[in-house]
Amino acid sequence: MADTNVNGGTQQATGKLKSVESLDQTNEMERGLSNRHVQFIAIGGTIGTGLFLGSGKSISLTGPSIIFVYILVGVIMFFLMRAIGEMMYRDPSQHTFINFITRYLGNGWGHFAGWTYWAALVLLGMTEITAVSTYFITFFDTFGIDLTHWKWLIELCFLVSLVSINLIAVKVFGEVEFWFSMIKITLICAMIATAVVMIVIGYHYPAVQIHGVDHVSPAGHAGFDNLFADFSFAPNGWMAFLMSFQMVFFAYEMIEFVGVTVSETKNPRKVLPKAINEIIVRVLIFYVGALVAIMCIVPWTSFKPNKDGSFASPFIMMFQYAGLNWASALVFFVVINAASSALNSLLYSAGRHLYQLSEVSPNPMLNKLGKVSDRKVPARAILVSAALILLSPIVNAIPGVSGAFVLFSSASSAVFLFIYILTLLAHRRYRRSADFIADGFVMPAWKVLNTVAIVFFVFIYLTLFLADDTRNSAIAGLVWLVGFGGFSMLRERYRSRDLKAALEHKE
């Protein structure tokens, strides 16, 4: 698993590892991201709002077994990242891992994956900007300040601020993401430390009205026995247990973001392997550690839905049990930070993907977006992506259109599974190609691990059909795969035929 030959140049029987400098001859971006930036970007990509707000529902579905689900899904995502990392290690000048789908599966699948991934990023950005404003309003509501009527202005201010960060320089983006990640890490570590103290002193807490819960939570105590009380591997049945996999998967979504930063990272062949190999450690600390701490304080049987079907944040529950009545404001401040980080990363990634698509497009209009600014960032592609994200409040306000938007937004999460599967298939082709570098950042037991990951992602997609709130998304995703995927393949077939005819005519 250790990477060797960091500086490149060693000839292998199956390929030659070129130096980063020689590969960068066509890379117009600036390598402004340091090791510190990338490591914290990787952490930020692992920790999303799902951990802070959504884990309550997943705990209620499976109880302590959710820890097993988080570990299993985390390991599979690690396999995916090792596959991406191996290909990126060979060619760190690529702006996106999607390029490897084009290289090893053909232009048809590359066209499908590239535009699908970019569209999914924009749709996720539209939902994320809505979420940021909602969390911002909730945060101030804890102080009795109503900002509901200023929702559109909040969204505009956040988006303008984050776009400005992305336009200044990649180093500035990296620095902002560093601090976003630091805030998330601090809250999780503070929560785990608080739980440890409560367990050690045998803390007992009274019945309390938790913010965001429409019923009084019962009195209890802190201890490891809460973790195993009334234990059942599938307390709500196997159907609920299977549904928890999709929820956990979406919590890990965008973990691949660190792979998009490679073309702008200093010493990528040294930094990338470290960032990827530490994914397992991050999963154990920030997900497993946090969930164990929560369930040692709050019995898993206490996670019950409100009348409207929503769940309170486990972090808010735990801190309020500890007597911190301002816990709600604290957690929502960090959630605003986490959502802002996600939106910031989506802008970065969407800009790079649109830049890459525009650069290779035969369309002259799109070619204009495939340019970098004087600050070495794809400014035009970022601005176009941001402009589409800014349509979110308008789309949400139009009757009929808003319902379709919700469907497509949720379907965009589902199509990430298609992208992941195509990436793994591209990795299989890479390993069998003359491009393979035996002394690179090689994925061990790749035939087994790659296959396991593909099968697992297919399984996750099938679980989307189990729940009413994800079934339509799964169907919409399949329609997109057949429709746009078929169009992309036919487009490439006709382009290849026309090119062949032109060459024959020239001869």
Protein language model features and the residues they cover:
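Helix-loop-helix connectors at the membrane interface of multi-pass transporters/channels
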Residues: 3, 9, 102, 129-154, ...
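Membrane-interface "cap" regions at the ends of multi-pass membrane proteins
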Residues: 1-56, 60-62, 78-82, 491-507
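Helix-loop-helix junctions that connect adjacent transmembrane segments
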Residues: 24-29, 66, 143-150, 182-329
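TM-loop-TM module centered on a large, flexible mid-protein loop between adjacent transmembrane helices
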Residues: 96-102, 106, 138-143, 215-221, ...
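Extracellular loop-to-transmembrane helix junctions
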Residues: 30, 53-154, 235, 282, ...
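C-terminal membrane-solvent junction of multi-pass transporters and transport-like membrane proteins
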Residues: 367-376, 417-469
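Membrane-interface loop-to-helix entry segments
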Residues: 150-218, 249-253, 276-280, 409, ...
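Membrane-helix boundary/coupling elements in multi-pass transport proteins
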Residues: 93, 116-133, 247, 252-265, ...
